[in-house]
A protein has these predicted regions:
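Short, charged/polar micro-motifs that form catalytic or ligand-binding hotspots
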Residues: 1-4, 49, 62, 121
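Sequence/structural segment immediately N-terminal to covalent heme-attachment motifs in c-type
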Residues: 1-17, 31-34, 148
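Residue-level detector of short, conserved catalytic/binding motifs and their immediate flanks
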Residues: 9-12, 57, 129
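Hydrophobic/aromatic-lined pockets within catalytic cores
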Residues: 10, 19, 136, 140
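Gly/Gly-Pro-rich "capping" loops immediately C-terminal to redox-active cysteine motifs
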Residues: 16-77, 85-104
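C-terminal capping alpha-helices of c-type cytochrome domains
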Residues: 67-148
Length: 148
């Protein structure tokens, strides 16, 4: 479900999921992966979401670079908090804002004190959890001996 949400929200229009070889850019120098992406990385993706735009960073290995679900929730809620100057839109509609304390406060998004608009709780919806689950599955760290 997270992959379908990634597609339906149009994330693919600004993010690619392919670490390009050195001769095509600085992906490896940027730390977007330990190696370039190869066809085997997409063997079980249907469809593979390679993308071509780089308005935002490549997400092929976002689970390596940002393995924290709370970071992703915060970034989706308001990208300006985690990435000042980002052109990514806010996905606040994926969160429930409530006066009721969640079952576990670890379920709530922890906003910086300087940002807090009010004292209500911001809780990721099921859709937000699915999207973050998908983002945390994007990891091409497995070694491929024949790939440099």
């Amino acid at each position: 479900p997270g992959k379908e949400l990634y597609e339906s929200l149009g994330c693919i229009y600004c993010h690619s999921q392919q670490v390009r070889p050195e001769e095509f850019g600085a992906d490896l120098l940027r730390g977007w992966g330990r190696r370039r992406s190869v066809p085997r990385d997409y063997l079980f993706d249907d469809p593979p979401l390679l993308g071509s735009m780089r308005t935002g960073p490549d997400l092929a290995n976002t689970a390596q670079r940002q393995p924290s679900a709370p970071w992703h929730y915060l970034h989706l809620f308001d990208p300006q908090i985690t990435s000042p100057g980002s052109v990514m839109p806010s996905f606040k509609f994926l969160f429930d804002v409530t006066d009721e304390e969640p079952r576990s406060t670890t379920d709530a998004v922890q906003l910086p004190e300087s940002y807090v608009e009010d004292q209500r709780w911001i809780v990721p919806s099921q859709r937000a959890r699915e999207l973050v689950g998908y983002l945390l599955s994007l990891d091409q760290k497995h070694a491929l001996e024949d790939v440099q």
